[in-house]
């Protein structure tokens, strides 16, 4: 009986360590390369700095995977920044060129007094950025909120 207990304990402990080791056996590049060529990805962004980073991520991913869907959903203060900060114009143009969709929350626009006409023509809007993200998830998008 004691031997059976020790054997079961050994198997359980061994399987835990094996699982942990095998989960970390992938290299960083293996993990990055697991992004699907035809995948659907979205990032929820609250500020200009994260918007810039999201655009550059979208550019990199779309360069390697042109069929990929990539969206950036903007909430909070970046809704105002996108309309007023000239330094963001080049990021909007990169997004348009690469086929990265930018969607701005109309609730944030209303809060900051921004109109759709204040934006670049390629910018889309949604009544509620959070509801839009839920919709993307329901449609198979992998999402990140910053």
Predicted segments with their positions:
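Secreted/extracellular ectodomain signature
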Residues: 23-146
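Bacterial Sec-dependent N-terminal signal peptides
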Residues: 1-26
